[in-house]
Design a protein with these regions (language model features):
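S-adenosylmethionine-dependent methyltransferases
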Residues: 1-216
Length: 216
């Protein structure tokens, strides 16, 4: 299926010493206010990527619920996708580099009621290195725009193989224009171990959404 990634309700709300601003996104009946860093050397984790917005919109269009489901996100960045999954009922583990966890925590606390917070864990995860400290019983794994270097692909694969089981559904979204050849090659690698189905494409932003399940 194909469609258009709609323009989010996103506007400047405030600035803090010129280094951060807040954007507002309406999705699934919630308004998420996400702090964005303007100046950072961790650029991959300090903006809301189109692939994450694509998955948010897909969850809304499909009326997905994560109630009583274990969810983990790899490379969560600002945390918007994990926050939505938490609000949709999931028991959510949010992971990224250690230096990004504080910003994720701030966004989680700004967008979720206290009643949700017993269901969220925020942890560092280095793909391919400390993934074995996490369980292998997740119902859903979320990945949005995390294939951006050739070296990352085998590390992502190793991590996904550990975290998943035969019942796990992996939603993997990519903005293909970031590096079409690299990303296409990455999906070919993943497809050797996972059934990899293109479930949606947002033509206007060149975002592909895939549903992966482990080959048996």
């Amino acid at each position: 299926m194909t469609g258009l990634l709609r323009k989010p309700i996103a506007h400047f709300i405030r600035g803090t010493c010129g280094s951060t601003y807040k954007l507002s996104y309406a999705v699934c009946g919630f308004v998420l206010e996400i702090d964005i860093k303007l100046v950072s050397n961790q650029e991959f984790g300090t903006m809301v990527w189109d692939a994450a917005l694509g998955l948010c919109q897909y969850f809304e269009e499909q009326k997905l619920s994560f109630s009583q489901k274990k969810v983990i996100e790899l490379g969560a960045g600002t945390g918007i996708l994990s926050i939505l999954s938490l609000l949709l009922g999931g028991d959510v583990t949010i992971t990224d580099k250690p230096q990004l966890l504080k910003q994720i925590e701030l966004n989680v606390f700004a967008n979720t009621p206290s009643s949700c917070r017993a269901r969220v864990t925020i942890r560092a995860l280095s793909w391919g290195f400390d993934h074995t400290f996490f369980p292998s019983d997740y119902d859903y794994i979320l990945c949005a725009d995390i294939m951006y270097t050739l070296a990352s692909v085998p590390l992502i694969l190793k991590t996904l193989l550990h975290l998943s089981n035969e019942r796990t559904v992996i939603y993997f979204a990519s903005t293909m224009s970031i590096c079409r050849k690299l990303i296409s090659s990455g999906y070919e690698t993943l497809s050797q171990h996972f059934n990899c189905d293109l479930v949606y494409r947002y033509e206007n932003k060149d975002v592909n959404l895939y549903r992966l399940t482990k080959r048996t």
